[in-house]
From Swiss-Prot:
The protein's name: Uracil phosphoribosyltransferase
Annotated transmembrane regions: none
CDD domains xref list: PRTases_typeI
Family: Belongs to the UPRTase family.
Cofactor(s) the protein requires to work: Mg(2+)
EC number: 2.4.2.9
Entry keyword annotation includes Magnesium: yes
Gene Ontology process terms (BP): UMP salvage; uracil salvage
InterPro entries in UniProt: PRibTrfase_dom, PRTase-like, Upp_B, UPRTase/APRTase, Ura_phspho_trans
Catalytic activity: UMP + diphosphate = 5-phospho-alpha-D-ribose 1-diphosphate + uracil
Organism this protein belongs to: Oceanobacillus iheyensis (strain DSM 14371 / CIP 107618 / JCM 11309 / KCTC 3954 / HTE831)
Length: 209
């Protein structure tokens, strides 16, 4: 069964407070999301394998460690997931980036797929699926399914916030996928929105309504 990790690092929680604040403007919101994504990436990559090497310093030769060649891929769910990609890439600049486009039908709350573009060698990569909000779990489920269908075997899901209902849906459908969060919120309301939430992440990132 996939694990759920909620990061309680003080910097993440401090910045998340201002991300939630309805008075935070688009520019600051975008910058805060970028910063939290970078901090979360630091935690998510904590278990990456390393290998021993020797490096020549200006003084002598020192035993050191480098990443053991593990390939990573980032797959934001369009469009809100785009707001977190640059923050992650600051720590993992060599990661390839794919995209999955989904929108939520306002009547059924179910996701509709309209775009999928992934790295050609996705089956060789550990994939981090990125979406700021995990609400009903439908979009994450469909995105993960689309990625698995194209050959990915190792997948993690990274979100700023989630509702317990959405987490359970993803865990049931994809028990092999670990979920990483900055916060677990209380619940979904009758319209499928996360409470207390942070509003519509895509609109707040891109200044749209």
């Amino acid at each position: 069964m996939g694990n759920v990790f909620v990061f309680d690092h003080p910097l993440i929680q401090h910045k998340l407070t201002y991300i939630r604040d309805k008075n935070t403007g688009t520019k600051e919101f975008r910058e805060l999301v970028d910063e939290v994504a970078m901090l979360m990436a630091f935690e998510i990559t904590r278990d990456l394998p390393v290998k021993e090497v020797n490096v020549d310093t200006p003084v002598t030769t020192a035993p050191s460690k480098v990443l053991a060649g593990k390939k990573l891929g980032l797959v934001p769910i369009l469009r809100a997931g785009l707001g977190m990609v640059d923050g992650v890439r600051k720590l993992i600049p060599a990661a390839k980036v794919g995209h999955v486009g989904l929108y939520r039908d306002p009547e059924t709350f179910k996701p509709v797929e309209y775009y999928v573009k992934l790295p050609n060698d996705i089956e060789e990569r550990e994939i981090i699926v990125i979406d700021p909000m995990l609400a009903t779990g439908g979009s994450a489920n469909d995105a993960i399914a689309a990625i698995k269908k194209r050959g990915a075997k190792n997948i993690r899901l990274m979100c700023l916030i989630a509702a317990p209902e959405g987490v359970e849906v993803v865990k049931e459908a994809h028990p092999d996928v670990d979920i990483y969060l900055a916060a677990m919120d209380e619940r979904l309301d009758d319209h499928g929105y996360i409470i207390p939430g942070l509003g519509d992440a895509g609109d707040r990132l891109f200044g749209t309504k």
